[in-house]
Amino acid sequence: QLGLASLRSIVQAFMAAHPGGMALLATNSLETPVLGLIARADGRRFVLSEVRERLARAAQRLQLGNFGIGDEFALLGAFVAGPQALRQFAGDAPVNTDDHPVVAYRAPRMTYAPDSLPRERLIALLRELKTEPAELFDAGADAAWSQRLAAYWKARDRFIEAGQHVRPDADVARMLLQVREPLMAVLRTSPEFRPAYDPLLRMATALARTDAAAARALLTELNRLQPARPEAGLALSRLAGSAP
């Protein structure tokens, strides 16, 4: 519902109130992308050890997987910008205020006479926003973790860009022709990026009913790329057990 010009004014106003502001994607949806602007009251970065402690406490009360938070990367991988990137994005856009409501006048135009699709605006936004993990998170001496998070962010952006060209198809073999290599490329960038792993796993399971050899090849590749996840290995075992 928003064009990038309106978003720049919103970000400008947010950063005026919260100089340490950050942005994250609420979903990876191409049709209805949702960007969240958040800030900490103390203006500090997030400390990785504290984030892990809070996630562990929350997991005692909630099934975090039901909220799409399978691990810390599923949560922290949603961030797309820190303060510096947001300031650069806002540039010299006019601040949206009560007495200068530029968004209220601009936003309807994007709804009634759009000049682009939501997916196109999302991809354009992600291409503008460049942030390093160290700007948002204090990982202590764990440099490898910061590299993994940066790889996750890169994989997320590649996943979103690849999705813009996909056309849904009820035939799993035809669907795999579209998405297999793009999703595998995403997993090679970051094996921890579940939104690429999960659909391939589901399609391999469906494919096993009609083409066991192709399903086995796909599951083997998934298991090689992400051995830390058990699902592909278990599916391979079931497939072997059902072979004549």
Regions found by a protein language model. Give the residues of each.
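Conserved Class I S-adenosyl-L-methionine
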Residues: G3-L25
